[in-house]
Amino acid sequence: MIKKAIARIVEQKDLTEGEMIEVMGQIMTGEATPAQIGAFITALRMKGETIDEITGAARVMREHATRIRAGKDLLDIDRDDINIDRETILDVVGTGGDGTNTFNVSTTVAFVVSACGVKVAKHGNRSVSSLCGSADVLEKLGVNLDITPETVEQCITKIGIGFLFAPALHGAMRYAIGPRREIGIRTIFNILGPLTNPAGADCQVMGVYRPGLVEKLAGVLHRLGCRHGFVVHGMDGMDEITTTTETLIAEVTTSGVSICTIHPEELGFSRCSMDELRGGDATANADIVRSVLQGVAGPRRDIVLINAAYALVAADRAATPEQAIALAAEAIDSGRAMEQLRKLIQITKD
């Protein structure tokens, strides 16, 4: 199938979701050769990935991931119909590759949101293009990443936050590592990671590196069954909600997708410069994360609060971003957010 798919894509013809599922199945099981994988993802990048193609690829990648069972399904039979009430699991994640070299905003947000009572399954990896990825900063903070899937599950169920280290949970991706490294360009795999949380997070804030991906990936999340989420792109290039300028946001609900643009002033934040948000290596970024969680005021706290607010809305912990900002600020100022970091360090080392 992959040979036929390459021929079609080279002619600028789209694949159906079913066809993409078949091709990705060949890639994830080692049936496709490295040359075929490289040709396929390059041709797909040149054509441009469709919602159908990304959705099909994400379904296969989810299927092959090591499953993290972090929530409980509650069966309610005290009704005429049977209803399964799933416990909310949230992910805050970005595609990376935005080139801004800011500190680890979404990683900091994860601790704040979990301190508000939301179970967070933070999916991430080491740095690819920036100085410090989420795994790098967590390791520097003292979190042990070399843990079993069962321990990850315990982190989420016992303390409300766990880190899902992508390489450890997406073993089938090993077949694509060589071709991806050798061609050295962004491909569909750069956007699949945030779509394939192994804990099955049904609520999400996903940052993307270019504005053209906002509506497209929101459509994919909707197709994949996201209950409530936001896909965001700061118009300064950040794969976060930014406080330097406006942010393009797509809200995903079970009924569809809606698009809007927000400005930091609308939520009571002053604009800052990109330099005020920049990070450094893992050591520098770990210091920044600690300072924000300890309550230090300034632009770094502001950008964490605004991103945490939308995460809390996605998890239905607050009805509006304004309400959510107050919850996030209280979680930091009370010390609960910092306590979540301490708990994660402890549980991963026990």
Curated annotation (Swiss-Prot):
UniProt keyword list: Amino-acid biosynthesis, Aromatic amino acid biosynthesis, Glycosyltransferase, Magnesium, Metal-binding, Transferase, Tryptophan biosynthesis
Top-rank taxon of the source lineage equals: Bacteria
- List, alphabetically, the InterPro entries matched: Anthranilate_Pribosyl_Tfrase, Glycosyl_Trfase_fam3, Glycosyl_Trfase_fam3_N_dom, Glycosyl_Trfase_fam3_N_dom_sf, Nuc_phospho_transferase
GO molecular function term, any single one: anthranilate phosphoribosyltransferase activity
The protein's required cofactors: Mg(2+)
What are the EC numbers? 2.4.2.18
Q: Which SUPFAM superfamilies match?
A: Nucleoside phosphorylase/phosphoribosyltransferase catalytic domain, Nucleoside phosphorylase/phosphoribosyltransferase N-terminal domain
Catalytic class of the enzyme: transferase
Provide the residue positions that the database annotates as binding anthranilate 1: G94, N125
Cofactor, how bound (note) = Binds 2 magnesium ions per monomer.
User: Which residues are recorded as binding anthranilate 2?
Assistant: R180
Listed GO CC annotations: cytosol
Task: State the name under which the record lists this protein.
Answer: Anthranilate phosphoribosyltransferase
* UniProt source species: Pelobacter propionicus (strain DSM 2379 / NBRC 103807 / OttBd1)
Q: What is the lineage of its organism?
A: Bacteria, Pseudomonadati, Thermodesulfobacteriota, Desulfuromonadia, Desulfuromonadales
What's the gene? trpD
